[in-house]
Amino acid sequence: MAKKVQAYVKLQVAAGMANPSPPVGPALGQQGVNIMEFCKAFNAKTESIEKGLPIPVVITVYSDRSFTFVTKTPPAAVLLKKAAGIKSGSGKPNKDKVGKVTSAQVREIAETKAADMTGADVEAMSRSIAGTARSMGLVVED
């Protein structure tokens, strides 16, 4: 018989750096999950990813307090900031431009995020990523 789902917990955790401190501890502690077990499993699964990159994770908690989790790709904004070599986006993206990304970089990010995005094709996903870049104050060059 299938296990009964008790809750879904969505978090963003730095790759390879999950520990019982907030936000992981309180979110999983409320559901009665073994926090250290999750931290070890998450860190093992994300060891191939650049350390410190925020990784969205969806944890499915079952009624017997067991869990499974699915990791997603890093947010587009984080990948764009990394590609442009900037710390943060612009506070006034329509006036102040803070950096530049090439259309090749945008396409590469779209291909990286293809598994998580619901776009019809890479071109549509590239346009979506380019829109995110513009809203952060980045200039997309051809």
From Swiss-Prot:
Keywords: Methylation, Ribonucleoprotein, Ribosomal protein, RNA-binding, rRNA-binding
InterPro entries hit by this protein: Ribosomal_uL11 (IPR000911), Ribosomal_uL11_bac-typ (IPR006519), Ribosomal_uL11_C (IPR020783), Ribosomal_uL11_C_sf (IPR036769), Ribosomal_uL11_CS (IPR020785), Ribosomal_uL11_N (IPR020784), Ribosomal_uL11_N_sf (IPR036796)
GO cellular component, one term: cytosolic large ribosomal subunit
Keyword Ribosomal protein attached: yes
GO BP annotation list: translation
GO molecular function: large ribosomal subunit rRNA binding; structural constituent of ribosome
Family the entry assigns: Belongs to the universal ribosomal protein uL11 family.
NCBIfam families (alphabetical): L11_bact
Subunit structure and binding partners: Part of the ribosomal stalk of the 50S ribosomal subunit. Interacts with L10 and the large rRNA to form the base of the stalk. L10 forms an elongated spine to which L12 dimers bind in a sequential fashion forming a multimeric L10(L12)X complex.
HAMAP family: Ribosomal_uL11
Classification via PANTHER family: 60S RIBOSOMAL PROTEIN L12, LARGE RIBOSOMAL SUBUNIT PROTEIN UL11M
Purpose of the protein: Forms part of the ribosomal stalk which helps the ribosome interact with GTP-bound translation factors.
Name of the protein: Large ribosomal subunit protein uL11
Organism field: Sodalis glossinidius (strain morsitans)
